[in-house]
């Protein structure tokens, strides 16, 4: 939808690749993605082909990436995994701290619901449909631009404040899975491994060392509990299991290092 990207460009989203446009500031990268759903997804969700969502999100360079991803090709034989183990741990540990393409990563995302546009039955509030004629397409385009201007830009501006960011992480509800509720999601809630990890690294960044220490210690406790349970239940076996193990061990090491830094920096 060229009109939408043109509107985004006026707001500073000068970089674009595929369905994503982004804008860099001193503290974060604001990302806007128009996600058109595949035919198979449309069939699964019982929405018409041509349905899409707008997905605003933010990337913060001081937060660790918690997206494990694929570490090796599917063709790699199990006999060779042990040879790659130490190498992969180092790779993931570095990857947790440094992301080469931050525009492809997001830490906090916002849910935006439509106000107008062609009807879909059943009516998912956060999915638009381009319709079957020019009038419907214009109506949808105008609504998407309006929601971006009235809500997405407010979301981006709100999270410019690091104090507001850490308040969100510590106090707000993650609205993941809430079909009718607008808000911020994908930070896991304030007592999850993800939420505690993000809170700890953000607090460290703004030199709130007491909050950072408490959050990261709780995060580490939860991670160690998870690690022990997975070990006991043989959930770290096979390719996928070993990938998960490598990632969990690397995240544990990363948090332990950050806690060591706090001991040195804390006044």
Regions found by a protein language model. Give the residues of each.
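Intrinsically disordered, low-complexity regulatory regions enriched in serine/threonine/proline
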Residues: 23-267
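A short acidic/basic microdomain associated with nuclease active sites
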Residues: 12-28
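Amphipathic alpha-helical segments
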Residues: 1-17
């Amino acid at each position: 939808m060229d009109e939408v990207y043109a509107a985004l460009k006026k707001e500073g989203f000068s970089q674009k690749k595929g369905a994503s446009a982004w804008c860099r500031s001193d503290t974060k990268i604001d990302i806007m993605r128009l996600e058109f759903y595949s035919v198979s997804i449309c069939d699964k969700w019982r929405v018409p082909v041509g349905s899409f969502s707008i997905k605003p999100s933010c990337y913060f360079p001081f937060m660790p990436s918690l997206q494990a991803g694929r570490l090796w090709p599917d063709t790699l034989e199990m006999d060779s995994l042990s040879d790659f183990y130490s190498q992969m741990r180092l790779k993931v540990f570095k990857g947790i701290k440094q992301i080469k393409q931050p525009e492809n990563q997001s830490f906090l995302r916002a849910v935006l619901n439509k106000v107008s546009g062609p009807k879909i039955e059943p009516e998912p509030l956060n999915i638009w449909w381009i319709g079957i004629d020019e009038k419907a397409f214009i109506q949808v385009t105008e609504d998407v631009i309006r929601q971006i201007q009235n809500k997405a830009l407010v979301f981006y501006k709100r999270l410019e404040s690091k104090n507001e960011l850490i308040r969100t992480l510590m106090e707000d509800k993650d609205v993941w899975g809430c079909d009718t509720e607008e808000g911020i999601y994908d930070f896991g809630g304030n007592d999850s491994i993800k939420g505690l990890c993000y809170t700890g690294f953000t607090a460290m960044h703004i030199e709130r060392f007491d909050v950072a220490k408490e959050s990261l210690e709780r995060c580490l406790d939860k991670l160690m509990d998870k690690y022990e349970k997975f070990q006991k239940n043989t959930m770290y076996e096979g390719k996928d299991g070993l990938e998960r193990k490598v990632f969990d061990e690397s995240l544990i090491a990363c948090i332990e290092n950050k806690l060591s830094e706090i001991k040195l920096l804390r006044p």
